[in-house]
Amino acid sequence: MSERVILAYSGGLDTSVAISWIGKETGREVVAVAIDLGQGGEDMDVVRQRALDCGAVEAVVIDARDEFAEDYCLPAIQSNALYMDRYPLVSALSRPLIVKHLVDAAREHKGGIVAHGCTGKGNDQVRFEVGFASLAPDLEVLAPVRDYAWTREKAIAFAEENAIPINVTKRSPFSIDQNVWGRAVETGFLEHLWNAPTKDVYDYTEDPTLNWSTPDEVIVGFDKGVPVSIDGRDVTVLQAIEELNRRAGAQGVGRLDVVEDRLVGIKSREIYEAPGAMVLITAHTELEHVTLERELGRFKRTTDQKWGELVYDGLWFSPLKTALESFVAKTQEHVSGEIRLVLHGGHIAVNGRRSQESLYDFNLATYDEGDTFDQSSAKGFVHVHGLSSSISARRDLGIK
């Protein structure tokens, strides 16, 4: 088996240190794989050069923005995926895509080992390693941060001692993960639950308490559950996310301060920014309310929750998730139409819906003249619907 190590490289502290550490401590060559998921910030050529400067024998940059949007974010939209009803899976969605490209790189560069920079406390170690086990069980996995108990202080010290070009200090110890779907910030003073986030924590969104901005009204169009237009203009899924990130972010939409239950059994505090994601999920959910039959909608809400839990728990490649997506695909056949939303002050307000597939019948719903609902049928329906409750109540109350 080859001694080459294929490393998931972010350009950040832990993976930059990992390149140098693997070379120095094990003598193995490192191929760094950096994936553009629309995270912005540094130019990917700069990230690639940093990997080489840290000691990688090769550094590969992959533009996966459209793939991420179409194959990972879109299923999350269609499953209205919010872990614990709040978190739109910002990091969790990206991990299986990274796994896929690392496995491909291992085959191409004849590497027998794949590596990541995850700690032993987080969910990402599970997402990576279960993914590797699902796609390439023959590959060995190296996790230096976890297996050698690196702390951020130790990593910073190693970076300083070895002149690793990374801009992190003990005074600004935030751990940040971001992509086009959103941004996650943790560690530092945020680990104390009573501490309020400071302005420097945020980047994708403006302060929602500043009400100087004019409300932004946006119309999002869907075709079979796929976002296809904004204000009547055709867009790809990636373009929809990017535009709504800008517009909703300018209105302070998408800030989330969450204490979540990690897969490893601990609770953690995370600050998320996901303006585009929250708008798209809100709009899609609302369109489903209009177009899905009641029992289908009720059941889908249970599968939506399960889908999100599976992705959060690192089971992207599981048979159950695959089966759930077949069900979700069937539910989307009539999820077409437009949702109008107002973005302002950190809030999303739906104020309009229209669809050729709508199950809303005005003549049945109206209380005004033109009502076609046969109210005479209601009395019998109510009696039959409550019959079992009535029978049990008579027994329990001793009424014959």
UniProtKB/Swiss-Prot annotation:
The record ties this protein, via NCBIfam families, to: argG, PRK00509.1
Q: What's the family? A: Belongs to the argininosuccinate synthase family. Type 1 subfamily.
Recorded GO CC terms: cytoplasm
Q: Which residues are involved in binding L-citrulline? A: 87, 123, 127, 175, 260, 272
Q: Which InterPro entries match?
A: Arginosuc_syn_C (IPR048268), Arginosuc_syn_N (IPR048267), Arginosuc_synth (IPR001518), Arginosuc_synth_CS (IPR018223), Arginosuc_synth_type_1_subfam (IPR023434), AS_cat/multimer_dom_body (IPR024074), Rossmann-like_a/b/a_fold (IPR014729)
- EC primary class: ligase
The cross-references to Gene3D superfamilies, in alphabetical order and at most eight, read: Argininosuccinate synthetase, chain A, domain 2, HUPs, Single helix bin
Q: What is this protein called?
A: Argininosuccinate synthase
Catalysed reaction(s) here are: L-citrulline + L-aspartate + ATP = 2-(N(omega)-L-arginino)succinate + AMP + diphosphate + H(+)
To which pathway does this protein belong? Answer: Amino-acid biosynthesis; L-arginine biosynthesis; L-arginine from L-ornithine and carbamoyl phosphate: step 2/3
- The EC number(s) attached to this protein equal 6.3.4.5
One Pfam family hit: Arginosuc_synth
